[in-house]
């Protein structure tokens, strides 16, 4: 008989082991057996909670997306002002939060993006993530720019955030979050200056 309350603990343990496995050996070599060994559980436990490796990857991505949403939300709730610039900066900062730029998170995001081109469930998650960023950016730009300019600025900033993140992930060095923020802030200010 399973212990009451173990499911959330076990799921978190397996997601953490997945992040560690992808960091150590990459997604292709992060087998169910390897992940189970890192988590200190049997292979059957993964099948019980996630059905298969794809289910575990999907749960891991949901975990990273929730961490991203929490990082952005925390920064936005802490704002002293309600200006579009302040909200947009908080979104930039949240996307470069430690939870998103650690080695395990970055490698897992990269594996997720590659897998999302072939797996419908992951493709849906990617579309949700992309739309959420674009929609939130566009909503703030729309407060000060005409609709077409707001959409253009939001698409540009979303692309810049993703591009800076991707370059940082592939650099092989520690992610320079301060430099990434400065570049994104510069683009943000260029777009907001169009409102004058």
UniProtKB/Swiss-Prot annotation:
Residues 8-68 form the HTH tetR-type domain. One of its GO terms (molecular function) is transcription cis-regulatory region binding. Keywords: DNA-binding, Repressor, Transcription, Transcription regulation. Transmembrane segments: none annotated. Residues 31-50 bind DNA. Pathway: Amine and polyamine biosynthesis; betaine biosynthesis via choline pathway [regulation]. GO terms for biological process: glycine betaine biosynthetic process from choline; negative regulation of DNA-templated transcription. It holds the Pfam family TetR_N. Repressor involved in the biosynthesis of the osmoprotectant glycine betaine. It represses transcription of the choline transporter BetT and the genes of BetAB involved in the synthesis of glycine betaine. This is HTH-type transcriptional regulator BetI.
């Amino acid at each position: 008989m399973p212990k009451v309350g173990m499911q959330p603990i076990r799921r978190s343990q397996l997601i953490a082991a997945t992040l560690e496995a992808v960091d150590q050996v990459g997604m292709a070599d992060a087998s169910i057996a390897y992940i189970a060994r890192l988590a200190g559980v049997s292979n059957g436990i993964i099948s019980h909670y996630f059905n298969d490796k794809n289910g575990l990857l999907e749960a891991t991505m949901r975990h990273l997306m929730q961490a991203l949403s929490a990082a952005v939300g925390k920064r936005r709730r802490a704002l002293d002002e309600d200006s579009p610039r302040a909200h947009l900066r908080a979104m930039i900062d949240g996307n470069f939060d430690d939870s998103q730029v650690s080695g395990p998170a970055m490698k897992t995001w990269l594996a997720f993006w590659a897998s999302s081109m072939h797996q419908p469930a992951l493709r849906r998650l990617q579309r949700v993530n992309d739309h959420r960023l674009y929609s939130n950016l566009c909503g703030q730009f729309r407060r000060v720019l005409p609709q077409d300019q707001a959409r253009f600025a939001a698409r540009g900033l979303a692309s810049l955030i993703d591009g800076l993140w991707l370059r940082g992930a592939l650099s092989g060095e520690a992610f320079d979050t301060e430099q990434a923020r400065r570049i994104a802030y510069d683009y943000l200010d260029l777009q907001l200056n169009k409102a004058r």
